[in-house]
Amino acid sequence: MPVDLDNSSTVSGDASVSSTGNQNLTPKSVGKKKRNLPGMPDPDAEVIALSPKTLMATNRFVCEICNKGFQRDQNLQLHRRGHNLPWKLRQRSTKEVRKKVYVCPVSGCVHHDPSRALGDLTGIKKHFCRKHGEKKWKCEKCSKKYAVQSDWKAHSKICGTKEYKCDCGTLFSRRDSFITHRAFCDALAEESAKNHTQSKKLYPETVTRKNPEIEQKSPAAVESSPSLPPSSPPSVAIAPAPAISVETESVKIISSSVLPIQNSPESQENNNHPEVIIEEASRTIGFNVSSSDLSNDHSNNNGGYAGLFVSSTASPSLYASSTASPSLFAPSSSMEPISLCLSTNPSLFGPTIRDPPHFLTPLPPQPAMSATALLQKAAQMGSTGSGGSLLRGLGIVSTTSSSMELSNHDALSLAPGLGLGLPCSSGGSGSGLKELMMGNSSVFGPKQTTLDFLGLGRAVGNGGNTGGGLSALLTSIGGGGGIDLFGSGEFSGKDIGRSS
């Protein structure tokens, strides 16, 4: 017993000494310099390099009674006090203890360098386990693994209780995942902003400017606005009047059958200028028309000349115009299906256009009629109409041979007569037709050596026949030697001989 007391007194004395020593050292600790940052040890510290086995070892100090292990000897001595076993604590010597630092045994690690050594044994052990050891502990909620048990316990307490929300709306339960995602999200947003800035510099109008037409026209205005009908040009020469002349109708027929009229802005511009359209028609047929002739002929209300050019009973093929404008140049309702044309040459009017997209096709040749049929038709038309309509009913169309060309001479302009070869008088109103009916026309005069009366050739020897007027005309149609019908010699004299 006295030994135990001595031991106890000794221990208590040591404890008291140590306690008094601690009390004496406490004022001195106030004047110590601040701790260095981790990895920046004191240059005078002792550098200790431990083996990986020593760093990974746990419970180096084991209790012989309960076999409980401890990492430090002091912890084991304190544990022994619980078993009423003798225990001994190391006394702090009065000498200044040299500070110890620990380096990582892995050569490639940052903390392998003595200048980056760690000043705590526990710190170097945890570092080695975290960076170079095996991760043994796994979280049941997020399946994250840990090499240090204390880290795993700390994570298990807060796992699932705190959420990290990114600006894009994504939720994260782990802070490290949130940090990684946020870095990627910020980089993506910065790249998008950069591309937008570049596109704005390259195409400023596309990005900033709106279409003024769209702004001016609202959807309601677009829906309420009625669809405009396709614009079709009105009548060619003059606006329709109650007493319309035959010449105006003939000009309409010529323009509709010769010109490829389309529903275009050009036709709309020329709808108030008949001279332009007639000039185009004359160029297509081969006539020479001047503006003065057009103005004079336009004021002429007697339609005899134009009536001889085109028959009022022409077939619908003569009125073939663009189907894009059906209301343009509409034919009369009293038209008959067949024409009294003496010409079989389809190249006089040129190809017509029925539909703008289709190709041009020539008109089919009209069947020839005998002289008897022509006379009967002339008698019928003469009984129902005036002189102008009689000649217009004949439907005599001029055609010449390939060797004969139309003259461009001013004295024999073919535009006012439209194929008759009658001289143009600037101030006259139908005088040419009157002279023809009375027999005083220069057509039958001695100066006219050759008469090309719409395809009815006349020999030089017959130029002296000046009497008769209309009877001479019918006589020249019906018989007599030296008449070359159509001027091309396609039919013999037997076909046109008078039947008595």
UniProtKB/Swiss-Prot annotation:
It is found in: Nucleus. At 3 days post anthesis (DPA), expressed in the chalazal endosperm region. By 6 DPA, expressed in the endosperm and embryo. In fully germinated seed, strongest expression in the root tip and not detected in the cotyledons. In 4-days old seedlings, restricted to the vasculature of the cotyledons, the shoot apical meristem region, and the root tip. By 8 days, restricted to newly emerged leaves. A zinc finger (CCHC-type) spans 164-187. Keywords: DNA-binding, Gibberellin signaling pathway, Metal-binding, Nucleus, Phosphoprotein, Repeat, Transcription, Transcription regulation, Zinc, Zinc-finger. Residues 207-216 have a biased composition (Basic and acidic residues). Disruption phenotype: Plants lacking both ENY/IDD1 and IDD2/GAF1 have a decreased responsiveness to gibberellic acid (GA). Zn(2+) 2 binds at C166, C168, H181, C185. One of its GO terms (cellular component) is nucleus. A zinc finger (C2H2-type) spans 61-83, 102-132, 137-160. Residues 174-186 are annotated as: SHR-binding. Interacts with the DELLA proteins (e.g. GAI/RGA2, RGA, RGL1, RGL2 and RGLG3), acting as coactivators. This is Zinc finger protein ENHYDROUS. It comes from Arabidopsis thaliana (Mouse-ear cress).
